[in-house]
């Protein structure tokens, strides 16, 4: 199994690469790519960790050597948020970066599963889909927006609030991956209940958690370490499913049946070909139903922005 990380010299990329070097199954290959010249050195640094995962690093304009034979590609390349910016302010720079990298994926490893971490995810996933479609290689079961950070944050905050072990809480999060489009289904956590006010406050905290980190880092970056952990969790789940493990479920932002929007984050059963089944979002509380209806315009606008970036 070969995993490629694009944007591997950045804060998320390095954290992700470290976790994958330690946790990928024995015999896996890990290839790191970034435009930054330090990237081969990051790979050498990680190569000294004693795990049976082969690692190589590549830098420069051309990601092709890193992509050859990749089964899974995780894209974290792009610029990070600064205080006062929201995820959509990143669009102007990151849209072009994602488009360029996905064009190279379409040529070099068109059958790979691709996980997009680069923000704004609501939009960059739509860009990736249109690029792959243009190249004639789009498979909607193999393109994912990685929203796992919303899930792990939800798990942490719920556990704190309710005095649970964080490892015992699993919160499904649906919708998208910014602001109001992030909707944790707090009503679906077994053995935990919330007043409507608690649910509203907690939902807001989960939606704004990224901004909390950006502000706390005081201009020094955005969420890199928790995002690296989230991306590793998603990437490792995907690898396990691709290798034939059954019952692997993760939430991610994918093209579905279009019931709510063309792309929508929901629980997915993963399998040997990527998405095996898009699972139902289940029964929502009145608050969740209102939140879902209230986000759809924003989500659809984000998606259209990405589609038009490629098609216009």
Swiss-Prot record:
The processes (GO biological process) annotated in the record are: malate metabolic process; tricarboxylic acid cycle
Q: Which cysteines are joined by disulfide bonds?
A: none
Catalytic residues in the record: 177
Documented EC number(s): 1.1.1.37
What the entry lists under Pfam families is as follows: Ldh_1_C, Ldh_1_N
Q: Which residues bind NAD(+)?
A: 7-13, 34, 94, 117-119, 227
Superkingdom assignment: Bacteria
One annotated GO molecular function is: L-malate dehydrogenase (NAD+) activity
Kindly list the positions annotated as binding substrate. 81, 87, 119, 153
| Gene Ontology CC: one annotated term | cytoplasm
The protein's UniProt keywords, in alphabetical order, are:
NAD, Oxidoreductase, Tricarboxylic acid cycle
Catalytic reactions on record: (S)-malate + NAD(+) = oxaloacetate + NADH + H(+)
Q: Does the keyword Oxidoreductase apply?
A: yes
Major enzyme class = oxidoreductase
Q: How does it assemble?
A: Homodimer.
NCBIfam families attached to this UniProt entry: MDH_euk_gproteo (TIGR01772)
Q: Which family does it belong to?
A: Belongs to the LDH/MDH superfamily. MDH type 1 family.
The record describes the protein's role as: Catalyzes the reversible oxidation of malate to oxaloacetate.
Protein name, UniProt field: Malate dehydrogenase
State the organism of origin.
Salmonella arizonae (strain ATCC BAA-731 / CDC346-86 / RSK2980)
* Lineage summary: Bacteria, Pseudomonadati, Pseudomonadota, Gammaproteobacteria, Enterobacterales
């Amino acid at each position: 199994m070969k995993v490629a990380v694009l944007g591997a010299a950045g804060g998320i990329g390095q954290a992700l690469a470290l976790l994958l070097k330690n946790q990928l199954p024995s015999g896996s290959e890990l290839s790191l790519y970034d435009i930054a010249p330090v990237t081969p050195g990051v790979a050498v640094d990680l190569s000294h960790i004693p795990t049976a995962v082969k690692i190589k690093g590549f830098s420069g304009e051309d990601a092709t050597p890193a992509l050859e034979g990749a089964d899974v590609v995780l894209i974290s390349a792009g610029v990070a948020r600064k205080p006062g910016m929201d995820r959509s302010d990143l669009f102007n720079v990151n849209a072009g970066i994602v488009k360029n990298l996905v064009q190279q994926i379409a040529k070099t490893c068109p059958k790979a599963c691709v996980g997009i971490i680069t923000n704004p995810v609501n939009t960059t996933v739509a860009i990736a889909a249109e690029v792959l479609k243009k190249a004639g290689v789009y498979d909607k079961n193999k393109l994912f927006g990685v929203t796992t950070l919303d899930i792990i944050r939800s798990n942490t905050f719920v556990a704190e609030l309710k005095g649970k072990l964080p490892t015992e809480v699993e919160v499904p999060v649906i919708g998208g991956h910014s602001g109001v489009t992030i909707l944790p289904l707090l009503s679906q956590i077994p053995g935990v209940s919330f007043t409507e006010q608690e649910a509203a406050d907690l939902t807001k905290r989960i939606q704004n958690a990224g901004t909390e980190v950006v502000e706390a880092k005081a201009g020094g970056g955005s969420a890199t370490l928790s995002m690296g952990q989230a991306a590793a969790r998603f990437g490792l789940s995907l690898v396990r499913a691709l290798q034939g493990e059954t019952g692997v479920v993760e939430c991610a932002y994918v093209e579905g049946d279009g019931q709510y929007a063309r792309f929508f984050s929901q629980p997915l059963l993963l399998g040997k070909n990527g998405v095996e089944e898009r699972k139902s979002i289940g029964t929502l509380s009145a608050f969740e139903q209102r939140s879902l209806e209230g986000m759809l315009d924003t989500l659809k606008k984000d998606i259209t922005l990405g589609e038009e970036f490629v098609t216009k």
